[in-house]
């Protein structure tokens, strides 16, 4: 008998039962293709995929699952919870990894590194979807249409929470009901209903902060997961090894780098009970109350284990006991030590402390058994800044010209908080521009959705925002550097080239220095006569390199209090390291670093020199920090500063020769209307011995001479016209001065040459050239 082979594909028990009912199962040989399922290890989602119900796997895995880009898959956690996603290819992960965001991870109760099962699934088109916000909102039909557009083709299931991007933030909507009631996806014919009454916040198990909300900090995230997440999720591993998990972690670093965010994300990812303690809130003037509060916090944590106690600004409640005069602080520290030693069920309660002053914390807390690990949270590098900008712009409508790579390069020294503020400020600029362009009336109750869709943030908005957001690390020492380019400095080509090599090259071509095996120069000393452009060169270096710029005026460092001057130097270098790449510019360095042993003061300058030597060539390396110093008295500088390893480059800034004087005059007269009889070459030849500052003064004086001539003419005309009427005279002379065009003539320059004299004599020039030769011999 001939047996027909019927090829049937099915994904549920329904097909099986139908075959039995038709009594075909016994008569027909069935080849059933069950939906293929594969196990994957969970990794973080890309920023662009957060909240979009996208799962990314390798192309090889997609072929194994028999899915194409955009198909729907079911992701099943270890305890059977499942979620839907659209599958997309990833080219930067292995075949056993899957990228899913915090919303999907939370709904199926898995964390980074856990295993999930993935299979292709059938999803029905939705006829109706009912949503509810998690907080009270006002909305109109245009918002409903916007939500529908956002959710188009996205797979949905009852009970899940969806983040809807709203300008710089998100609004969470919960899926209350769907028709049909199984897995569905939104189509053009789907009826979207949004209820006004919000669902209860407590009923939601979705994260407010996930790992994807933290740009950068990959190393810190990995360390903190090893210390906290592994013991809480898999205590049996530590029991097998016969070791106790850590009790505490101290996160330290500058303000705004993400310490608090890191702790919150950790608690959300592992589903731990989270208690936030702000250090100063613990303190009380009543005897024993501060200690009682701490005991209650630890008791609450143990009752709700697994839990995390996060103590922000821990230095406020646990300072060094020998440094404080109050008894309250000492008792609080003692209580904290006792409670951390007495934590039961290690690995179930973790204490995380955060501070930007780790040295101020009592040493007894900083030993194994209390704060077992200390993790430094550093300001982000260029790649980290780009990651952070991606986090803060992922829900922002931006134009195609927004270049996050360029913005990351321009924001040296910016912390995560600074970059968040930058994104918000750019959005405000865009809003202001949009309102002006569209002439919107903000008093009207609603703005049409089609107009709102045109609102986008441009690169120009970010550049404008950069002007008002300063890096917080340098706020105390930040200097707004005037925009000075190399072209604004006439002559000095050799000096400019040396500065480019020492400062710009290491920042622009770091790989070149890595390959060569040499370290860039640490320090550059510019010396020469006054007025030759030393400070101007430092400004140009800061502008052209794009590095952060700290200007230190020598005399400002000096203090009558013992140790204050050295502390000021230490703080400057500490901030420079944190905000690297940084240029520290010491103007008039001879005032704070003279030859030791010769000064008659109380020894403050000697201590400053010692501190400078230690900072420039000490144990702590100067990574991407360049020191530029300027002086016109190199003969009185301490010799120890002038050796290689401190000031590696000693650059003589000479007075300009004739060619350089011509270039300087061209720079200073580029916006000055010159008469045809003016020859800058002739003026440059006559200005022998003039420095750059002298030539600037010469041009200024010549211009004022021309203005004097205009004033004399206008004064005569006004007096003749107004005949003693003072009100008429003031009005007439103002109009005359503002309307009359003028040009600076050769005669004006001749008069100026008689007024502005050269500040350098031949003897001065010879003396500085002698200094230059002596210094070169000294360092040779």
Swiss-Prot record:
It comes from the Archaea. Keywords: ATP-binding, Nucleotide-binding, Repeat. GO terms for molecular function: ATP binding; ATP hydrolysis activity. InterPro entries: AAA+_ATPase, AAA_ATPase_CDC48, AAA_ATPase_domain, AAA_lid_3, Asp_de-COase-like_dom_sf, ATPase_AAA_core, ATPase_AAA_CS, Cdc48_dom2. SMART domains: AAA, CDC48_2, CDC48_N. ATP binds at residues 253-260, 528-535. Transmembrane segments: none annotated. Belongs to the AAA ATPase family. CDC48 subfamily. Not yet known, shows ATPase activity. NCBIfam families: CDC48. This is Protein SAV.
């Amino acid at each position: 008998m001939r047996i027909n082979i019927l090829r049937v594909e099915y994904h549920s028990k329904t097909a099986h039962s139908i075959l039995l009912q038709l009594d075909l199962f016994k008569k027909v040989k069935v080849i059933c293709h069950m939906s293929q399922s594969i196990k994957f290890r969970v990794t973080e989602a890309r920023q662009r995929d957060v909240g979009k119900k996208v799962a990314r796997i390798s192309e090889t895995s997609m072929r194994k699952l028999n899915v194409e880009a955009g198909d729907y898959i079911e992701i099943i956690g270890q305890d059977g919870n499942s979620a839907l996603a659209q599958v997309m290819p990833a080219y930067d992960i292995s075949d056993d990894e899957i990228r899913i965001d915090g919303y999907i991870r939370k709904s199926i109760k898995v964390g980074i590194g856990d295993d999930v099962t993935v299979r292709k699934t059938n999803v029905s088109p939705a006829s109706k979807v009912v949503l509810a916000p998690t907080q009270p909102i006002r909305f109109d039909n245009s918002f409903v249409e916007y939500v529908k557009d956002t959710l188009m083709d996205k797979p949905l299931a009852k009970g899940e929470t969806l983040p809807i991007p709203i300008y710089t933030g998100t609004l969470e909507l919960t899926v209350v009901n769907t028709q049909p009631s199984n897995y569905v996806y939104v189509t053009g014919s789907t009826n979207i209903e949004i209820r006004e009454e919000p669902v209860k916040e407590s009923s939601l198990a979705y994260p407010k902060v996930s790992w994807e909300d933290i740009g950068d900090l990959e190393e810190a995230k990995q360390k903190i997961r090893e210390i906290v997440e592994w013991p809480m999720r898999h205590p049996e591993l530590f029991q097998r090894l016969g070791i106790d998990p850590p009790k505490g972690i101290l996160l330290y670093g500058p303000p705004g780098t993400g310490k608090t965010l890191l702790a919150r994300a950790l608690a959300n990812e592992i589903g731990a009970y989270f208690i936030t303690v702000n250090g100063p809130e613990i303190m009380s003037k009543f005897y024993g109350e501060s200690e009682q509060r701490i005991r209650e916090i630890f008791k609450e944590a143990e009752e709700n284990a697994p839990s995390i106690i996060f103590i922000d600004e821990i230095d406020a409640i646990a300072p060094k006991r020998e440094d404080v005069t109050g008894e309250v602080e000492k008792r609080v520290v003692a209580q904290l030590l006792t409670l951390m030693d007495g934590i039961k069920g290690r690995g179930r309660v973790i204490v995380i402390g955060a501070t930007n002053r780790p040295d101020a914390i009592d040493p007894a807390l900083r030993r194994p058994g209390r704060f077992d690990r200390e993790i430094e949270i550093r300001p982000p590098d260029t790649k980290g800044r780009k990651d952070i900008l991606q986090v803060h712009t992922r829900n922002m409508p931006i134009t195609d010209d927004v270049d996050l790579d360029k913005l990351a390069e321009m924001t040296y020294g910016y912390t995560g908080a600074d970059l968040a503020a930058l994104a918000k400020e750019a959005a405000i600029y865009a809003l202001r521009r949009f309102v002006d362009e569209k002439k919107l009336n903000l008093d009207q109750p609603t703005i049409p959705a089609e107009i709102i869709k045109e609102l986008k943030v441009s690169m120009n908005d970010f550049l404008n925002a950069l002007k008002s957001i300063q890096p917080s690390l340098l706020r105390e020492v930040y200097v707004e550097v005037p925009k000075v380019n190399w072209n604004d400095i006439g002559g000095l080509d050799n000096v400019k080239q040396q500065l480019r090599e020492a400062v710009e090259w290491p920042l622009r071509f770091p790989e070149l220095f890595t390959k060569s095996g040499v370290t860039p120069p640490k320090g550059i000393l510019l010396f020469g006569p006054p007025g030759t452009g030393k400070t101007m060169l430092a400004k140009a270096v800061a502008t052209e390199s794009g590095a952060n710029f700290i200007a230190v005026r020598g005399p400002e460092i000096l203090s009558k209090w013992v140790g204050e001057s050295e502390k000021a130097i230490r703080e400057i270098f500490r901030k420079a390291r944190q905000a690297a790449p940084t240029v520290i510019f010491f103007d008039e360095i001879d005032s704070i670093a003279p030859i030791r042993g010769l000064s008659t003061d109380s020894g403050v300058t000697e201590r400053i020199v010692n501190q400078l030597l230690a900072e420039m060539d000490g144990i702590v390396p100067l990574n991407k920090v360049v020191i530029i110093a300027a002086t016109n008295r190199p003969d009185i500088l301490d010799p120890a500063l002038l050796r290689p390893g401190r000031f590696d480059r000693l650059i003589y800034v000479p007075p300009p020769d004739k060619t350089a004087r011509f270039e300087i005059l061209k720079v200073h007269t580029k916006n000055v209307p010159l008469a045809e009889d003016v020859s800058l070459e002739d003026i440059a030849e006559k200005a022998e011995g003039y420095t750059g500052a002298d030539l600037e003064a010469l041009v200024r004086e010549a211009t004022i001479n021309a203005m004097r001539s205009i004033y004399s003419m206008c004064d005569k005309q006004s007096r003749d016209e107004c005949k003693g009427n003072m009100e008429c005279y003031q009005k007439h002379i103002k109009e005359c001065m503002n309307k009359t065009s003028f040009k600076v003539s050769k005669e004006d320059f001749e008069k100026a040459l008689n007024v502005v004299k050269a500040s350098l004599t031949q003897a001065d020039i010879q003396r500085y050239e002698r200094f230059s030769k002596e210094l070169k011999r000294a360092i040779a």
